[in-house]
C-alpha cells in the first residue's frame, strides 16, 4: 500500500480500525520459517515502519504475531504501554498465546484482544474463553472458514485443484481427497442448516461464531468482492442460544478431517 495508503485511509480514517502485527521475521535459510523476535528495539523498529508504510499517526490495534520464548511477556507489555502513552498505538493484543502469557502480560498493560485459529473445525481455543471473559479481553478468530473449506465453494476440489507453491491450500490436509470424503457428512449438515436459515454456508459458520459471545469477532479473508459481501452477511444471520448449542452438539459427533494447524483425530 506504499504511496497510496493516505489516499485510501484519509477520507474515512475515523471509521475504520487499522490493525497490524509485530514480532516475527522470516528465515532466509530454512524455507521461510517464522522466527519470533520481540526484543524491545525490534518492536520499536517495527511500529515505526508500520506507521510510515500506513501513513497514519497511530495504529488502533497492534498484535504480537507470535510469542518469542526469549522475551518475557512483562517486557513486551511494558513496551506496549510505552507506545500507548506515546500515542503510536491505541490498543494491543497477542496472537496464538497460552493463558499464562496472557495473564502475565495483561497485568502490566491490559490486553484488548487475543487472536487465534477458530472455526467449526477448530474449537480447541474455546477452553480459553472463560479466561478472556474474566479479564475483559476480546477475541479475534482467524481462519474462521477453515481456509475456505466451510464456505462450500471447494466441495469438489482437492489439493490438485490449487496451484502448487503459489496457493498454500495445495498443501493443506483438509483438501486431500481422503479429507474431502471424510467431511462429506459435516458439509451436508452445514448446507442443510444454512438453507433452513436462508443463508450460505459461510454466513452460517460466521453467524454461529459471532453468536457465541459479544466480545468475539472474525476476520475471514477473500480476494473476491462477492465473497466479502457474502461473508459480511453472516452478521445479519441470527441464531438463538438453543440453535448454537444444537450445532455444537452436532459438531461434537460429526467426523472431521485434520485441517491446517489442527489435528481432529
Model feature map: region roles:
Residues 1-20, 159, 256, 264:
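N-terminal binding-site loop/beta-alpha segment at the start of enzyme catalytic domains
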Residues 5, 40-43, 47, 73-76, ...:
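Aromatic/hydrophobic pocket-lining residues that form the small-molecule binding cavity
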Residues 6-17, 51-55, 84, 105-109:
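Acidic (Asp/Glu)-rich catalytic clusters
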Residues 29-44, 65:
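Active-site mouth loops of central-metabolism enzymes
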Residues 38-53, 98-103:
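Short, acidic/polar
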Residues 51-70:
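Active-site groove signature of glycoside hydrolases
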Residues 67-254, 259:
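Beta/alpha (TIM)-barrel catalytic core signal, keyed to glycine-rich beta->alpha loops juxtaposed to Asp/Glu
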Amino acid at each position: 500500500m506504499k504511496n497510496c495508503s493516505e489516499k485510501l485511509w484519509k477520507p474515512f480514517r475515523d471509521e475504520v480500525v487499522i490493525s497490524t502485527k509485530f514480532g516475527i521475521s522470516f528465515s532466509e535459510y530454512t524455507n521461510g520459517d517464522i522466527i519470533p523476535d520481540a526484543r524491545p528495539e525490534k518492536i520499536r523498529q517495527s511500529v515505526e515502519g508500520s506507521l510510515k508504510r500506513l501513513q497514519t499517526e497511530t495504529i488502533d490495534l497492534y498484535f504480537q504475531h507470535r510469542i518469542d520464548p526469549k522475551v518475557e511477556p512483562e517486557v513486551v507489555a511494558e513496551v506496549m504501554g510505552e507506545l500507548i502513552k506515546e500515542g503510536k498505538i491505541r490498543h494491543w493484543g497477542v496472537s496464538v498465546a497460552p493463558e499464562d502469557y496472557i495473564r502475565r502480560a495483561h497485568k502490566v498493560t491490559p490486553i484488548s484482544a487475543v487472536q487465534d485459529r477458530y472455526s467449526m473445525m477448530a474449537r480447541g481455543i474455546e477452553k480459553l474463553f472463560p479466561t478472556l471473559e474474566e479479564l475483559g479481553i476480546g477475541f479475534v478468530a482467524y481462519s474462521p472458514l477453515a481456509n475456505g473449506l466451510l464456505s462450500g465453494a471447494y466441495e469438489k476440489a482437492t489439493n490438485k485443484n490449487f496451484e502448487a507453491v503459489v496457493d498454500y491450500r495445495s498443501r493443506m490436509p483438509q483438501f486431500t481427497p481422503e479429507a474431502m470424503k471424510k467431511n462429506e457428512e459435516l458439509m451436508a449438515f452445514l448446507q442443510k442448516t444454512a438453507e433452513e436459515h436462508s443463508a450460505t454456508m459461510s454466513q452460517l459458520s460466521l453467524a454461529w461464531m459471532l453468536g457465541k459471545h459479544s466480545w468475539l469477532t472474525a476476520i475471514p479473508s477473500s480476494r473476491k468482492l462477492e465473497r466479502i459481501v457474502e461473508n459480511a452477511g453472516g452478521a445479519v444471520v441470527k441464531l438463538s442460544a438453543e440453535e448454537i448449542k444444537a450445532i455444537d452438539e452436532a459438531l461434537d459427533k460429526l467426523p472431521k478431517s485434520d485441517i491446517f494447524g489442527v489435528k481432529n483425530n
